[in-house]
């Protein structure tokens, strides 16, 4: 075969392959367009599909064209109504685990914030964990000295419940070293307290935008709940303290609508001390169980009505629930006065169940270790010592810390009552352990119709970290 014949042969073969390739593409397109849509189980090629995720991540509009998806991210629409939250609390026979973030364990090798004061609050579509960061990460040099409560680096951030407080999923909420947050059914309201001790300011955010402020009125570390505020029929309530931590201070209850303060009242409580209230809605009122950091080992109780009238006293039960505290057998209880002579304290909570009360407390009487929740018959109204239920959440070999309350709204549960829930903070690092940092993780429990076995859902991180050995 001469060279010209070889060229002609190669060219003919190449041309044949090109024609065959074109025919194969035509067949493929014909099958895709004509045959596949004929199957009743598949949507048409150019159908637009709206996918709404039950979380605050995104809503997608997916336009399907042949084998290509075009995804457009849409802004989540506002709910068109406020949550009611006037229902009574559901009766709880026990508390089942809802979530656990394991933030410190993950943070030994992950990008997790150094935090304290975590708490949970829920909207009609989700629950979120809020926390106060220290503007630093675990196992990093900036974590040094984070045992300090107040600094210009502290911020309120949040993640979806169960997620660790990591840099990739956290959402900024407010600049704050003290905070509260709640959802009215339409938008989140957050309140962050920041600034110098003598002139601190609380900034109210609604839907992520600053909408109002509260300036310190007593000039002594204005502070708030470190747990969920409470919204009832579109109006949101919270409690603030300004004044000494170890003697008489000043206390106020506030009410806001869509981020604007519409009312406040001074709470008269001579001889009593109120800090870090854990509040929840119940039968149209706000019920709070707080911390007495002055003398009482029983907890203050504050019940706020929609018109901001209130009743204030102490949890009646004949068992103390603050830490440090004395022996149960030596405690008598009082509905009106602080009992015991133990200064300091720890944030805690309680739930009214008719005349009974569920009350959480550390297992240790002297330190923030272990955690249990007790049900005391008639403990909301009498100095009763009759303990009818007890559940251990963290054993006494492991550290606990703050604890607080929130409820699951009926929009989430589809029940006709509000599910009582609580969280327990588990503090690690300074001052109890040999580290340069202080941080915490949390376990969250919700009321159920069954008794739940004792167990220890403790933090579990192995300390010290690498940064502590340098």
UniProtKB/Swiss-Prot annotation:
Activity regulation information from UniProt: Inhibited by the neuraminidase inhibitors zanamivir (Relenza) and oseltamivir (Tamiflu). These drugs interfere with the release of progeny virus from infected cells and are effective against all influenza strains. Resistance to neuraminidase inhibitors is quite rare.
Q: Write down the required cofactor(s).
A: Ca(2+)
Establish whether keyword DNA damage is in the entry.
no
Report the record's Gene Ontology biological process terms.
carbohydrate metabolic process; viral budding from plasma membrane
The ranges of region (Hypervariable stalk region) come to 32-86
- Tell me the protein family, please: Belongs to the glycosyl hydrolase 34 family.
Instruction: Quote the protein name from its UniProt record.
Output: Neuraminidase
Q: What organism is listed for this UniProt entry?
A: Influenza A virus (strain A/Herring gull/DE/677/1988 H2N8)
| Organismal lineage | Viruses, Riboviria, Orthornavirae, Negarnaviricota, Polyploviricotina
């Amino acid at each position: 075969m001469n060279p010209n014949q070889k060229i002609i042969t190669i060219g003919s073969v190449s041309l044949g392959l090109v024609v065959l390739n074109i025919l194969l593409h035509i067949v493929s397109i014909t099958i895709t367009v004509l045959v596949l849509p004929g199957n009743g189980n598949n949507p048409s090629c150019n159908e637009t599909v709206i996918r709404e995720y039950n979380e605050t991540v995104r809503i997608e509009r997916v336009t399907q064209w042949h084998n290509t998806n075009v995804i457009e991210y849409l802004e989540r629409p506002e709910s068109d109504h406020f949550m009611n939250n006037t229902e009574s609390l559901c009766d709880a026979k026990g508390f089942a685990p809802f979530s656990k973030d394991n933030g410190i364990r993950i943070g030994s090798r992950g990008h997790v914030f150094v935090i304290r004061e975590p708490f949970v609050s829920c909207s009609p579509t989700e629950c979120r964990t809020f926390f106060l960061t220290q503007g630093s990460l675990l196992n990093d040099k900036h974590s040094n000295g984070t045992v300090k409560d107040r600094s210009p680096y502290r911020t309120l951030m949040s993640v979806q419940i169960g997620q660790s407080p990591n840099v990739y999923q956290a959402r900024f909420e407010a600049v704050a070293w003290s905070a509260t947050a709640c959802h009215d059914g339409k938008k989140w309201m957050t309140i962050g307290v920041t600034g110098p001790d003598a002139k601190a300011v609380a900034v109210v955010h609604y839907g992520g935008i600053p909408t109002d402020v509260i300036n310190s009125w007593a000039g002594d570390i204005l502070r708030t709940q470190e747990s969920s505020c409470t919204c009832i029929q579109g109006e949101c309530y919270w409690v603030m303290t300004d004044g000494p931590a170890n003697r008489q201070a000043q206390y106020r209850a506030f009410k806001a609508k869509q981020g604007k303060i519409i009312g406040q009242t001074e709470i008269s409580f001579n001889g009593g001390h109120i800090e870090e209230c854990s509040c929840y809605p119940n039968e149209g009122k706000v019920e709070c169980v707080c911390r007495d950091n002055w003398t009482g080992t029983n907890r203050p109780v504050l019940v706020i009505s929609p018109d901001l009238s209130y009743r204030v006293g102490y949890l009646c039960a004949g068992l103390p629930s603050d830490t440090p505290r004395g022996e149960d057998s030596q405690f008598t209880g009082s509905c009106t006065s602080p009992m015991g002579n133990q200064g300091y304290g720890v944030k805690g909570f309680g739930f009214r169940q008719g005349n009974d009360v569920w009350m959480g407390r550390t297992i240790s009487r002297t330190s923030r270790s272990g955690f249990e929740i007790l049900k005391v018959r008639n403990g909301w109204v009498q100095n009763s010592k009759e303990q009818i239920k007890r559940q251990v959440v963290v054993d006494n070999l492991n550290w606990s810390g703050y604890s607080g309350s929130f409820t699951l709204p009926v929009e989430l549960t589809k029940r006709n009552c509000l599910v009582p829930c609580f969280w327990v903070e588990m503090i690690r690092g300074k001052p109890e352990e040999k580290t340069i940092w202080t941080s915490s993780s949390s376990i969250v429990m919700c009321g159920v119709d069954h008794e739940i076995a004792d167990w220890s859902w403790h933090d579990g991180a192995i300390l010290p970290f690498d940064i502590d050995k340098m």
